[in-house]
């Protein structure tokens, strides 16, 4: 597997960064895209890296926030063949804050109906290609995390804490174990790993890639996450985006060589 980071908070050289995330993944002779970042930057960086978005065979949206979906329009303009897999719970209804402080942080308006022929929204765990799966959340009570993070979804005229039912993991099965991608891990990396473990009957997990959404947590809470990662037995965590520099430093001090930080243009071979 070859992974190229197209969009992340950290730029590198002539590759610009942004608050967003996008991965280009080559696996078993096919090309996948996970998320489109917060703008068209993923495509600009891809061109610099010699990656043609038109060649992507399959695209996946991790969740319905703007920093992972705002480049979808650019993707559909550049690519005429790939299906785009989203959660059936991904709607234009995600907000940060309440009242006068509320701001829309969701999908580009109209993006799903205007591309309905290519949007796929399977329910439950789905094998979208050979040895490639999307795994939705199956854990109750995640709305308490949404409340703490000041993240909400609009249902009618009501705003309720986000339970992240629109979030899903992208999982690849390899000969040496599972590779899990979860772009923001809003529910917690420990919850994601537990859900994937149940879905795949505790198959070995080779690596975990994505943001960990730790920038709002205290130092002690971040250390607790490090302990849970150690207890999981995963020996390769590659993170960035919403993890935050402070949290990454704490994780690095605990996990050492088991964790690395990605950036735009980084190529990861697994």
Q: For each predicted feature, which ranges?
A:
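Glycine-rich phosphate-binding "P-loop"
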Residues: 1-13, 150-161, 210-214
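Conserved beta-strand hairpin/beta-sheet module of binuclear metal-dependent hydrolase folds
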Residues: 1-49, 163, 167-181
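Divalent metal-coordination and catalytic microenvironments
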Residues: 25, 35, 46, 63, ...
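Short hydrophobic-aromatic micro-motifs
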Residues: 32-34, 128-137, 179-182
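Active-site metal-binding motif and surrounding structural segment of the metallo-beta-lactamase
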Residues: 41-92, 200-207, 230
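Metallo-beta-lactamase
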Residues: 90-168, 231, 260-269
């Amino acid at each position: 597997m070859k992974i190229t980071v197209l969009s992340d908070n950290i730029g590198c050289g002539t590759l610009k960064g942004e608050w967003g995330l996008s991965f280009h993944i080559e696996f078993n002779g096919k090309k996948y895209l996970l998320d489109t970042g917060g703008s068209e930057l993923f495509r600009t960086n891809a061109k610099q890296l010699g990656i043609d978005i038109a060649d992507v065979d399959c695209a996946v949206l991790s969740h319905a926030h703007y920093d992972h979906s705002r480049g979808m329009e650019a993707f559909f303009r550049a690519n005429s063949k790939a299906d785009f897999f989203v959660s059936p719970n991904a709607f234009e209804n995600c907000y940060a804050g309440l009242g006068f402080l509320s701001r829309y942080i969701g999908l580009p308006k109209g993006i799903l109906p205007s591309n309905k022929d290519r949007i796929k929204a399977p329910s439950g765990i789905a094998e979208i290609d050979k040895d490639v799966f999307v795994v939705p959340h199956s854990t109750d009570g995640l709305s308490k995390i949404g409340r703490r993070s000041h993240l909400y979804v609009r249902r009618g005229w009501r705003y309720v804490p986000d339970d992240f039912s629109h979030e899903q993991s992208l999982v690849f099965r390899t000969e040496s174990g599972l590779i899990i991608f979860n772009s923001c891990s809003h529910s917690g990396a420990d919850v994601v790993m537990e859900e994937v473990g149940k879905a795949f009957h505790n198959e070995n997990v080779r690596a975990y890639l994505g943001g960990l959404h730790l920038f709002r947590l205290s130092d002690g809470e971040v250390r607790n996450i490090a302990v849970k990662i150690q207890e999981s037995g995963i020996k390769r965590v590659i993170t960035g985006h919403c993890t935050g520099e402070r949290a990454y430093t704490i994780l690095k001090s605990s996990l050492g060589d088991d964790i690395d930080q990605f950036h735009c243009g980084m190529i990861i071979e697994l």
